[in-house]
A protein has these predicted regions:
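Short, solvent-exposed loop/linker segments at the N-terminal edge
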Residues: 38-46
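Solvent-exposed segments in extracellular or luminal domains encompassing
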Residues: 82-96
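Exposed beta-strand face motif in extracellular beta-rich ectodomains
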Residues: 48, 96-102
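Solvent-exposed loop segments of extracellular immunoglobulin-like
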Residues: 60-65
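A short beta-strand segment in extracellular, disulfide-stabilized domains
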Residues: 45-54
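Proline-centered linker/hinge motifs at extracellular inter-domain junctions
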Residues: 19-23, 28-31, 85
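Low-complexity "stalk/linker" and mucin-like segments enriched in Ser/Thr/Pro/Ala/Gly
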Residues: 32-38, 68-84
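Extracellular acidic, Ser/Thr/Pro-rich low-complexity tracts
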Residues: 53-58, 106-108
């Protein structure tokens, strides 16, 4: 009987603690931009500070990967691997009614992956 209890006690410690996915608390969106229906409008060439606030319940290190859709015309991120890069607005798409979306993939290194999407961004020509 004692052996079974000892083995049961050892076995209980073998199960890893479940990982919690990161959670986006704010963003991704241009810092200070109002919540407006239909999207946000920025003049081409404007440098925008992006806002993103993330929490990981397990206090895992969090990694970021920013991208833009559609990829062309390409805006410029100051870095695609930090939480709050700047992004320079590209020239307008051929169809001025085509929105641009910024995406951020947030990963905690323990298979917790989350993707955030900005509001629609429309480019105003200079």
């Amino acid at each position: 009987m004692f052996v079974l209890l000892a083995l049961g006690g050892l076995g209980a410690g073998c199960y890893p603690t479940p990982n919690h996915m990161p959670v986006i608390l704010k963003g991704p969106r241009p810092l200070g931009s109002p919540s407006t229906p239909g999207g946000l409008k920025f003049e081409e060439g404007t440098e925008i500070q992006l806002q993103l606030e993330v929490k990981d319940q397990d206090n895992d290190e969090v990694f970021f990967r920013w991208s833009q859709v559609p990829a062309e015309p390409a805006g410029a991120f100051s870095s695609t691997t930090v939480a709050t890069p700047t992004w320079t607005v590209p020239s307008p798409p051929e169809d001025p009614n085509t929105p641009i979306y910024l995406y951020v993939e947030v990963e905690d290194g323990n298979d917790g992956i989350l993707i955030g999407q900005s509001p629609a961004i429309f480019v105003i020509p200079k």
